[in-house]
Amino acid sequence: MSTDHIRRPIRRALISVYDKTGLVDLAQGLTAAGVEIVSTGSTAKTIASKGIPVTRVEELTGFPEVLDGRVKTLHPRVHAGLLADLRNPEHEAALAELGVEAFELVVVNLYPFSQTVESGASVDECVEQIDIGGPSMVRAAAKNHPSVAVVTDPQGYDGVLAAVSSGGFTLAERKKLASLAFQHTAEYDIAVASWMQSTVAPEQPETDFPRWFGRNWRRQAMLRYGENPHQQAALYADPGAWPGLAQAEQLHGKEMSYNNFTDADAAWRAAFDHEQKCVAIIKHANPCGIAISEVSVADAHRKAHACDPLSAYGGVIACNTEVSPEMAEYVSTIFTEVIVAPAYAPAALDQLTKKKNIRVLVASEPQDGGAELRPISGGLLMQQRDQLDAAGDNPANWTLATGSPADPATLTDLVFAWRSCRAVKSNAIVIVADGATIGVGMGQVNRVDAARLAVERGGERVNGAVAASDAFFPFPDGLETLTAAGVKAIVHPGGSVRDEEVTAAAAKAGITLYLTGSRHFAH
């Protein structure tokens, strides 16, 4: 028969907390229920200051707190009381022989290590906030959950008092508390280990990739389903990470879906790939349109939508600047799943929230740098995020392979086309006119098909436009598809064994061809 439902009365509690939130109410409640309280340092002082009976830990151990408080509870008379399995008669006999009393409750929270690091404190100050005794007590109590309940979060204090009044926690409840406690110390240890690793020279100075890395992921939301209705899904966030889309504030609309998040992330990154006012419209993680404008964000949105209005239906929109009332008015006429921006004009927000189904998000600007992680079977791939910071992303470093140098307007469009390529799944061809994509060929397994798709999408607008390819043309056919449609200038990385043939085809067509020397695959 299961004993999970049997309650173990709480007669003695050990309390040692840095965060004093709710401490006095907890101590008063425990005392009123007849629970003896043993405590340490400032925790004991806070409890005693309210006239609540408390036994200081040094009275228990017969050993003073020493080394500026580094040693308080690291003593056999404390840990024997935490680790004794009261189901074991030999353990009970050992306690009696030693004159040690067991604890049935441990309430501990830890020094604020992560907050200290984030504050910019010195190395020595951070080291002082690495808790030793606290995690030791938490882990001991969690290990011994058949006999001890452990609580590490002040939000759990009401549950403690409720359990005390009901005869104690059940074994099932202590197991749950132990699980939470081990999660707490694991998060703490990851934070300490990650910081400590960052303070020492890497084993391989030529790489930014550590031998070990850890992350703290907390479930932030359950999602309705995953990519498909038969798949379950959830959103996780790293509390210590730079605020991003996972921390976006939703101002309006129904809950976000898995696909909403993936498309919004792609759109958000695409919009911030450009310095001018930019709007990106994404569907299935690929652009329906991207555009920039020196005039207004509404103008950028109009141009982005015009790239592929059919595909933009039900898409996700991202802006790198405040959404204006004019843009919001246009967006409200189109079925849109999500719009995300750093800010909204009040009138724009009023307009958008009249639409029942659109999800309106405010998010912080994406952080530069960082790493991308991709799970694979049995492992994880890590790479530096593609931030358009390669040497070839600067047009000053481009090589003119053939044709006349581009005039300023043409060069501006070429740069925009090149930067927009990063947001398109490979193989990618982007055709641009007047700061807007007009034809996008994406996700094709050969480059000539990507060129054909981009030309088909662009139609008559392609004549006189410019184009970019995210990787080199392996054969002249892709470039010839573009020039036959009227593209006047092209930028691509170069590097193919057939570069001379490709350049010759460009010269024959009389167009301008630039080489970047950098590639922007996206898979």
Curated annotation (Swiss-Prot):
InterPro entries: AICAR_Tfase_dup_dom_sf, Cytidine_deaminase-like, MGS-like_dom, MGS-like_dom_sf, PurH-like. Its EC number is 2.1.2.3, 3.5.4.10. Keywords: Hydrolase, Multifunctional enzyme, Purine biosynthesis, Transferase. The keyword Hydrolase applies. It catalyses: (6R)-10-formyltetrahydrofolate + 5-amino-1-(5-phospho-beta-D-ribosyl)imidazole-4-carboxamide = 5-formamido-1-(5-phospho-D-ribosyl)imidazole-4-carboxamide + (6S)-5,6,7,8-tetrahydrofolate; IMP + H2O = 5-formamido-1-(5-phospho-D-ribosyl)imidazole-4-carboxamide. One of its GO terms (biological process) is 'de novo' IMP biosynthetic process. Pfam families: AICARFT_IMPCHas, MGS. Coiled coil: none annotated. One of its GO terms (cellular component) is cytosol. GO terms for molecular function: IMP cyclohydrolase activity; phosphoribosylaminoimidazolecarboxamide formyltransferase activity. Pathway: Purine metabolism; IMP biosynthesis via de novo pathway; 5-formamido-1-(5-phospho-D-ribosyl)imidazole-4-carboxamide from 5-amino-1-(5-phospho-D-ribosyl)imidazole-4-carboxamide (10-formyl THF route): step 1/1; Purine metabolism; IMP biosynthesis via de novo pathway; IMP from 5-formamido-1-(5-phospho-D-ribosyl)imidazole-4-carboxamide: step 1/1. Residues 4-152 form the MGS-like domain. Belongs to the PurH family. NCBIfam families: PRK00881.1, purH. PANTHER family: BIFUNCTIONAL PURINE BIOSYNTHESIS PROTEIN ATIC (PTHR11692:SF0), BIFUNCTIONAL PURINE BIOSYNTHESIS PROTEIN PURH (PTHR11692). HAMAP family: PurH. The IMP cyclohydrolase activity resides in the N-terminal region. This is Bifunctional purine biosynthesis protein PurH. It comes from Mycobacterium marinum (strain ATCC BAA-535 / M).
